[in-house]
Amino acid sequence: QWAGMAGTGLAVTDNGSSAIFHNASTIGFSQEAMGVSYSYSKINKAFALQSASLFYRIGREGKHGFTLGFRHFKEPELGMIGNNQNVDFRPRIWDLGVGYFRNVSQNLSLSLTLRYLQAKAFEDMDSKRTVCLDFGATYHRNMAILDEMASWSVGFQAANLGRKLDGQKLPARLGLGGAIDLPFTMENRLQVALDLNYLLPSEIRHLQAGVGAEYNFLKYGVIRGGYHFGDNDKGAGNYGTLGCGINYWPIRADFSYSLADKDCFMYRTWQLGIGIVF
């Protein structure tokens, strides 16, 4: 979902399975009690990202719960010479996260996520490790339109707060997002989201933004689109996104493709995901 909407997800409350990667506190306002998901992304033809996650809301009212997430990122192969023979090695990094979320009031949810990261840059080097924290908050309210079924949300996340990895500071991120959900009928629904993110430290310091929309039609079909504004030298750059999906309860399948120039990191990037919710 988030990939088809230009990476927006800080305030989107209907995708609990992958919320740990954006803002785990949004799960507090999810309509589902639990869910699992898996996605595969091919980035710029040479990079690969795999993600798996789950969430579970505890108790009848589901006011609190936990979420788990795993991501594995591979870079292009490096042609190296070692022990008198050529070695093809792909640098990689993976992280494992566990988060806890809780509704502290009817309209406010908070979350805290602990993540363990491990990276390996060269075949003959030891892996480097570190830990970091993500903090999230979401404020959600219904609107006095569409029989009070419409709603709006504001989400905040402070991510990658932790120790250095192999002597390098983690790319910390401060994000603020908003979303409006408009269910016109049981079969037709529009959702619009906007995210603003500020990345630091100084080497990658810049502001990036994304705006995305999702339309559910005929109960099961989904189409998405969005545009991401960024810095080509310090981040993902400027690119558009298109996406589609099928929601046939309890199964959810999604596909997205990035529309980017050749000098953009997101050039020829696509993602395929599948999930199950209950």
Residue ranges with predicted function:
Residues 1-278:
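Subset of outer-membrane beta-barrel
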